Amino acid sequence: MSIWQPGPRPAWVTALNETCDPGWITLDADALAAEAREKTGLDDFGDDRFWEPFRIFVDSLNEELALHTMGALLIRGDLVNALTIRLQLTEERKRHPQVTQENVDRPIFITGLPRTGTSITHELLAADPRHRAPQHWEIRTPFPAPETATYLTDQRIAEADRQIRLWCEIVPEYDSMHELGGAIPVEDVQVMGGSFVSDEWMGRHVVPAYAGWYNEADRVPGFEFHKQMLQHLQWKCPGDRWVLKSPSHMSQLDALLAVYPDARIVFTHRDPLKVLPSVVSILYSTAYVRSDQVDAEAMANWFTGETCKMLLDGMTSLRASGRLPESQCYDLRYAELMQDPVAALGGIYEHFEIDYPDSSRAAQQSYIDNKPRGKHGGHKYDFSDTGLDLDEERERFSDYYARYQVENEA
């Protein structure tokens, strides 16, 4: 497989990595927890189930991943931040028990294979002023709780923007792969990060031991933490409904429904053969933010045609079983979304019996008008980069193409 290769790093990043030993940056589970306690003056991390995946992940970082110095600094900050949020969230729920009674009613979840339009669908539904979507700034720094009066002007938005700019300086090509910004809606894996039962940790790092644990783990604790975060975020800044998103939900729909039995789920559909080369290059670039030694072959083997087929078959089987009623599902095709986004979104509103006023349509159209495709440069990839046989892969997905009326793009 031919995989996207990064360009040279900025001189300052190279200088830091060459002159400072990453071993100087301690990644020890107990020391990280102690730092979070000292930072907050709090001691209760809440549900003890997080300790096992947290420790496995930290051990995996130390034993399996060759972090460069900048990468070690970034992950250390991420881990202390996640632990800090756990402490603050637990304390808030004790001091303000009314937060635990906040009702998360019929949230809309968007999921599908990666690169099938989940992000733009999420952003457009979030552009409806009645909707609430978790933004990067309030997930990175959720305390104090966001408030309606200052939501659009909170100083944490600018702080989050600066953090994201740092990522894009370390790997400049990263900017062209995704819309990024402090006030951009984020994936649920980030909301779930503090549970340590989340693709957030596996998606940024090549950590086989943690991945092995995660793939066999009960995902419900991740969604329980997710719901606690939503209760916190909506306490002083509510919306009519939550709109949420993550391709990772394709592998954990049962767990999602265990915590959100009334969830309404939008499944995005696109030719899997268009998806494959794009996903691998994004995984590679994300890992490269934190390590110079990224195994391209391992990345390619992590997300394969077999992986896609398993996820799609799992979705279809769940729906066929009746455990996920069709009244709670909507199928959104990428081709229709690209052709006429507002009309395509209209189908979601109609299916879920949500009113769709002109003000919502206008807000979404304005978002589209201010976000032309390719605005940040192109993320270029081609099926030929995979080294796979096109006809064989098309046959693999023939049932999927027919059932969900998906166009061939490769």
Label for each model-derived stretch:
Residues 109-128:
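Glycine-rich phosphate-binding P-loop
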Residues 140-242:
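PAPS-dependent sulfation machinery
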Residues 111-113, 243-247, 269, 334:
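Short His-Asn-centered micro-motif
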Residues 249-254, 273-276, 338-341:
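Flexible loop/turn segments at secondary-structure boundaries
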Residues 245, 256-281:
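Conserved phosphate-donor/acceptor-positioning beta-strand/loop module used by diverse small-molecule
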